[in-house]
Amino acid sequence: MDYDLLIKNGQTVNGMPVEIAIKEKKIAAVAATISGSAKETIHLEPGTYVSAGWIDDHVHCFEKMALYYDYPDEIGVKKGVTTVIDAGTTGAENIHEFYDLAQQAKTNVFGLVNISKWGIVAQDELADLSKVQASLVKKAIQELPDFVVGIKARMSRTVIGDNGITPLELAKQIQQENQEIPLMVHIGSAPPHLDEILALMEKGDVLTHCFNGKENGILDQATDKIKDFAWQAYNKGVVFDIGHGTDSFNFHVAETALREGMKAASISTDIYIRNRENGPVYDLATTMEKLRVVGYDWPEIIEKVTKAPAENFHLTQKGTLEIGKDADLTIFTIQAEEKTLTDSNGLTRVAKEQIRPIKTIIGGQIYDN
């Protein structure tokens, strides 16, 4: 068989030998060894890992925004990330402009449409409910079916003004009117209170910033235990997503949750230019290292940046190393080296291992990291 690209001598994160062949931008073969010729062959060094391309399901990468912005390839292909999902930076009135720009990126870019029609042009996009127009959201979803993979509602004090839980009620209505499209909900300081938010969320809805260190988070700061209503949401199938961000990941909360048996379903950064350049986020790999230091193992960490986000946002051609899927791969090493990691609240932990992307393959095209 003649392939476009053959990757030799790789191993999965579980340590199993793997070789991958690519033809016409799709995975054509996956096996311990593959024979056959290819236009290009990559021979990996011993101890090099290959996974499905990493997916970051919470980023902000519409470069024309002033508040939260970045450039898809700076947080994507250059960092070992093959696919990013912009989490509601734009709304129905400006998502088409974002779409046009996103098509120029090497990185695969998808978007969640903010239920507020201009997105995050200011911090309080849900303070004026006249900006939430279901018909406009529906139009955006219908006009950009290969780009819009969900909707976003930011449910915290600085965003909602005096509107309480109402914006989330509107978001749930919009979701129901659009074939139960995925919904991501941002949480932060009250109001609204987290128990009100979680009561409205259903199985498959994505709760981002799940391990924030705020009083309105999942941890009861008086008892140092996970709140009962957070467990109820977790057990009914609400998707707990990291969404690290500048203010929204706390080591102690994540460690306490793990001790009690609660794990994030997906790992994401909430990255934008300032927390990329100045920290504490930097990139997806650093966020993955933080979950390793909390106590997650590498195979589950990789699953939480590949298969899990692909399933949550219905990216059916991505997320696994299977024949016929898109030829998006991340090639990386895991080195035994110490590194101090800092969360959003200034807490530090010393990682014993560093994960480093060395090549990113998107649609069969190779990019060095």
From Swiss-Prot:
| Free-text cofactor note | Binds 2 Zn(2+) ions per subunit.
Provide an example Pfam family for this protein: EF_0837-like_N
- Stretches that traverse the bilayer: none
Q: What is its EC number?
A: 3.1.1.-
Q: Which UniProt keywords apply?
A: Hydrolase, Metal-binding, Zinc
Sorted alphabetically, which SUPFAM superfamilies does this protein's record hold?
Composite domain of metallo-dependent hydrolases (SSF51338), Metallo-dependent hydrolases (SSF51556)
Q: What positions are modified (N6-carboxylysine)?
A: 152
Question: What general EC class does the enzyme of this chain belong to?
Answer: hydrolase
Site (Transition state stabilizer): residue numbering on this chain:
154
Gene Ontology MF: a single term: deacetylase activity
- Sites where the protein binds Zn(2+) 1: 58, 60, 152, 270
Binding-site list for Zn(2+) 2: 152, 186, 209
Q: Which domain of life is it from?
A: Bacteria
Instruction: Identify the cofactor(s).
Output: Zn(2+)
In its keyword annotation, does this UniProt entry include Zinc?
yes
Q: What functional role does this protein have? A: Esterase that can catalyze the deacetylation of acetyl-(R)-mandelate, but with very low efficiency (in vitro).
Q: Which NCBIfam families match?
A: EF_0837 (TIGR03583), PRK09237.1 (NF006689)
Q: Which family does it belong to?
A: Belongs to the metallo-dependent hydrolases superfamily. Atu3266/EF_0837 deacetylase family.
Name this protein carries in UniProt: Deacetylase EF_0837
Classification lineage: Bacteria, Bacillati, Bacillota, Bacilli, Lactobacillales
